[in-house]
């Protein structure tokens, strides 16, 4: 059984027991989060596709922790003009463990 949820403007395919990293959520470590924006639920041969969400479907997850991704570098350069600019960015994330899929 798996589901497709929407979080942080992105869609994630989740399976019970799996851990995944999503955009930063305002939740404390150890707390439980319920996702109501379930776009699809697949259980064996049964497939439920929402329009836009599956009615009554929920995905629960436990917050494992928060952190930051690896640094990415943004570099601007103009050739022959001796102009170079560097910037770095580390995006925050929330790590979740999927505890249940219903629907």
Swiss-Prot record:
Entry keyword set: Ribonucleoprotein, Ribosomal protein, RNA-binding, rRNA-binding
GO molecular function: rRNA binding; structural constituent of ribosome
One of the GO biological process terms: translation
Entry GO CC: cytoplasm; ribonucleoprotein complex; ribosome
SUPFAM superfamilies the record matches: L21p-like
Keyword Ribonucleoprotein recorded: yes
Signal sequence annotation: none
Known role: This protein binds to 23S rRNA in the presence of protein L20.
HAMAP family attached to this UniProt entry: Ribosomal_bL21 (MF_01363)
Membership in a protein family: Belongs to the bacterial ribosomal protein bL21 family.
Protein name: Large ribosomal subunit protein bL21
Organism of provenance: Acinetobacter baylyi (strain ATCC 33305 / BD413 / ADP1)
Gene this protein is translated from: rplU
